[in-house]
Every structure is written in structure tokens, then in C-alpha cells.
């Protein structure tokens, strides 16, 4: 007998540098002063399931420079991006504007996917116990959940994954109603023609 497993794409998990983690966390702790961002994830009565805020240009530059090599690594390890097949030739990849997610005990992120090609979630401040869930179809068409259990020791870690991979975050429990889970998320996209023509700095990911 020789069992065979069908191939699939996956995700990359790694850790921020200490300096970048401290810089992002510092801004995350005061990001309510930044512009509010709408993600479209709402409760049935039309309220966002948790607040979202923009990230400073300075931290965006640091973050994008850090993440760039991981995009190349993902493309080397998984066939997903090169198999998309909607373009006549390769094109550069660019970063969308990231955002902070602030979640208190009653907040959550329902099952959803992102725009773009790849997405990332960076855990900056975590409660005693929470989880991040991927959901995808098996080869038999059934729904399968992949759960990542998180504790404060996971602060500073991040995931890079396909944007169309469904994921969710359930509410966490805490005796402190003001305890806050801080996560930074963002998307990586194909660079549009207009942006490509007008830009003096074109990414070299192809």
C-alpha cells in the first residue's frame, strides 16, 4: 500500500524583527488617533464587528521592506501566484494600505477573504487565549477548519497567505472589558497599469 496525498498551497509563518515589532506596537496602542478604515465586515445591524485604523507612512515603508523577501519566498515554495492565469504575462506586485484591527472581548471577525493576491496578519498584542481560523474545502468538497491557537507569546509573529483563503477570528474571553487584541493586516496586489506607468519605483516581483 502506498498512500498518496494531493498537493495544496499553504501559508508562511515567521516573526518580525524586534525593532519593527516595537514600532508597530507603539503605533497600534495609539492608532485610534489615526484615520478610521472600513473593511465592510459588519454585524446584521450594519455596525463594523471591530474598529480598524490606518497605519503611518513611516511604518508602512518599514513593513513593506521587511515583507518583500517573504513574498519571493512564498512564490518559490507554492505554485499559487503563478497559477492564477488571468494575465498574459507576469506583472509587478505592490502593497495595499494596511490597517490595525482593535478587538475587545465582544469583537470578532466573521469568516471572510481579502482583495489581492496575498494577505498578511501580524499579531502585536494578544489576550491570554484566542485563535485564528483558516477554512477551506477538502478534495471531497467538505469544509475543513485549520485553527491556530494564540497566546501572548505569539505577539510579533505573522502569517502570509493567499488572499482568497477564508479566515475568521472569534471573540476572546477576558475579565477586563477593555483588554485589546491588536492585529495589523494588509494585502499584496498585482500592480495596475496606470500605477505602473506613473510610478518611478516599480517593484521587481514578477
Regions found by a protein language model. Give the residues of each.
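Double-stranded beta-helix
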Residues: 185-206
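Non-heme Fe(II)/2-oxoglutarate
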Residues: 1-90, 106-109, 205
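Catalytic core of non-heme Fe(II) oxygenases with the double-stranded beta-helix
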Residues: 93-165, 170, 179-182, 194-197
Amino acid at each position: 500500500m502506498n498512500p498518496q496525498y494531493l498537493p495544496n498551497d499553504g501559508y508562511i509563518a515567521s516573526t518580525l524583527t524586534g525593532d519593527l515589532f516595537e514600532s508597530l506596537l507603539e503605533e497600534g496602542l495609539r492608532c485610534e488617533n489615526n484615520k478610521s478604515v472600513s473593511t465592510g465586515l459588519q454585524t446584521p445591524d450594519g455596525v463594523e464587528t471591530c474598529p480598524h485604523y490606518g497605519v503611518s507612512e513611516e511604518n508602512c515603508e518599514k513593513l513593506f521592506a521587511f515583507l518583500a523577501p517573504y513574498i519571493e519566498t512564498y512564490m518559490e515554495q507554492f505554485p499559487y501566484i503563478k497559477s492564477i492565469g488571468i494575465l498574459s504575462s507576469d506583472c509587478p506586485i505592490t502593497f495595499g494600505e494596511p490597517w490595525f484591527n482593535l478587538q475587545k472581548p465582544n469583537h470578532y471577525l466573521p469568516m471572510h477573504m481579502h482583495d489581492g493576491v496575498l494577505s498578511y496578519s501580524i499579531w502585536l498584542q494578544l489576550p491570554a487565549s484566542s485563535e485564528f481560523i483558516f477554512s477551506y474545502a477538502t478534495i471531497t468538497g467538505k469544509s475543513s477548519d485549520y485553527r491556530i491557537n494564540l497566546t501572548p507569546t505569539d505577539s510579533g509573529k505573522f502569517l502570509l497567505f493567499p488572499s482568497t483563503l477564508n479566515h475568521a477570528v472569534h471573540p476572546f474571553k477576558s475579565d477586563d472589558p477593555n483588554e485589546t487584541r491588536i492585529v495589523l493586516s494588509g494585502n499584496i496586489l498585482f500592480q495596475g497599469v496606470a500605477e505602473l506607468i506613473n510610478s518611478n519605483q516599480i517593484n521587481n516581483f514578477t
